[in-house]
A protein has these predicted regions:
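C-terminal hydrophobic structural anchor segments
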Residues: 365-399
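Periplasmic polypeptide-binding modules associated with outer-membrane biogenesis and secretion
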Residues: 6-123, 134, 148-167, 291-296, ...
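C-terminal structured domain segments
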Residues: 397-408
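Gram-negative/organellar outer-membrane beta-barrel architecture
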Residues: 73-74, 85, 91-93, 98-262, ...
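C-terminal outer-membrane beta-barrel translocator/porin domains of Gram-negative envelope proteins
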Residues: 250-254, 258-371, 378
Length: 437
């Protein structure tokens, strides 16, 4: 939950359910659609085909669609999203026909599925090869419920199970368990300083509210246990690293209006999370407890038919003394949360590097759409770190830049990038094939 990122979700959706954030509604041919400038139009009759009466009533009530009222294309897209995400219809279409001074709207759905299983693979120069397997089951219970299981095989492997109850639409009570194995090299200024290996067990309970379009909010509690194997090896010594269990309470808010998980052309993303962590369930005062706040934002602006500008900023701040190593800030790599949940990506740094208690990264990407699915991107990012948020302007600064080529395929992007930073002072090469997970 702490590192829920859109590309990862899109990967699992495509692997398990067969679609992702690039899905666009299918409009039947031979129909008269309102033009883009008439995005809000009057609907006379609303018809449903192969959709149950209860589902139709829920769609109309939730999306605000009614006969003889003004309806927007966004409302129709929201209804179709519900048919796919909530009711698991694999083939959803809509059509509108003009009748005098109004339109008749028809929603069609086919091939409703009770469960889905999937398999995916990925290769990159950071994690080598990895395979993901997943299943999503809709259970036949009085209260709508689901069971999801996802497993990853690779150098960093995990298995995750989620059980959710949805007594009301958009309001979900979830229970989760995850086992994760981590074996990673930790760098400092581009050089390996030690190796860290451990098993992590996480159990959690959460409540999610998804009522507003593009927004979701979540509150929850979770417990996380760390079991260290080969604790540390290398030139650095870290004291007081013991097997331990931590308790945390958190809340987060997400907003995502981007049209695609990879190579979006419009929209923004925002993520904010606050949490409080303690190593004793009966004592939430310092020095046993500490606070965490993390946030990220990015948007995209089309400069022309082929050029797009994508600025972003992300950061994480810790409040407390003697922060345990598993919760310390970290940066590096091409993907957020790849090795640890709190990892912030940074172009020009290939491996995970620990950071001080206050860390902020800003980046800007200039992307050129070379051909239909071919993209060339120039990236520049800069970071600042210090022991306290108030001292961040006087902290250590470092920068990095890179040039990336990407080819977007139905099986995931193929990307190659050269990068450099004054943190590592090395020319780096990265190659990735497949969706991030």
């Amino acid at each position: 939950v702490a590192a829920a990122h859109r590309p990862q979700l899109d990967s699992l959706r495509r692997v398990v359910l067969g679609y992702d954030g690039t899905y666009l509604p299918t409009v039947l041919p031979g129909r008269s659609l309102p033009s883009e400038k008439d995005a809000v139009f009057k609907v006379g009759h609303v018809l449903f085909e192969n959709i149950s009466d209860n589902e139709a009533k829920t769609l109309m009530r939730t999306c605000g669609i009614a006969e003889n009222t003004q309806v927007s294309l966004q409302q129709i897209e929201e209804a179709m999203r519900l048919l796919r995400d909530k009711y698991l219809y694999m083939d959803v279409t809509y059509s509108v026909t003009q009748d005098q001074n109004h339109y008749d709207l028809t929603l069609r759905a086919f091939h409703k599925s009770k469960s889905k299983v999937g398999l995916g693979a990925r290769f990159d120069t950071e994690d080598m090869a990895s395979v993901i397997m997943g299943a999503d089951l809709v259970l036949n219970t009085r209260v709508p419920s689901r069971l999801g299981v996802v497993g990853k095989l690779g150098e960093q492997y995990y298995v995750r199970a989620n059980f959710s109850l949805e007594p009301h639409l958009y309001r979900t009570l979830g229970f989760s368990y995850e086992f994760r194995n981590s074996d990673m090299n930790i760098n400092h200024r581009g050089r390996r300083v030690y190796n860290l290996s451990y098993h992590r067990h996480t159990v959690g309970v959460s409540f999610t509210h998804l009522r507003l379009r593009n927004f979701s909010g979540e509150i929850g509690i979770k417990g996380t246990g760390y079991d260290y194997g080969d604790v540390l090896s290398g030139v650095y010594e870290v004291d007081h690293l013991k097997n331990k269990f931590f308790y945390s309470a958190y809340t987060n808010l997400r907003y995502n209006s981007q049209d695609k998980g990879y190579y979006p052309m419009r929209g923004s993303k925002l993520y904010v999370e606050c949490s409080y962590v303690s190593d004793k369930i009966a004592d939430w005062s310092r020095p046993h407890a500490f606070g965490v706040m993390s946030a990220s934002w990015e948007t995209i602006s089309r400069l022309s038919r082929r050029f797009a500008l994508q600025p972003g900023v992300r950061g994480r701040v810790l409040w407390g003394r003697d922060i345990p190593l598993p919760f310390a800030n970290a940066y590096g790599g091409s993907m957020a949360g790849k090795y640890v949940d709190q990892q912030l990506p940074f172009v020009g740094v290939s491996r995970l590097e620990p950071s001080k208690a206050a860390l902020m990264v800003a980046d800007v990407k200039l992307r050129y759409n070379l051909l239909k699915n071919h993209y060339v991107t120039g990236i520049f990012n800069v970071a600042a770190e210090n022991d306290k948020l108030s001292n961040l302007p006087r902290g250590r600064y470092f920068y990095g830049f890179g040039f990336k080529y990407g080819f977007d395929t139905r099986f995931g992007p193929i990307e190659a990038m050269f990068s450099y930073s004054n943190n590592s002072e090395k020319l780096l090469f990265y190659l990735g094939v497949g969706f991030d997970f």
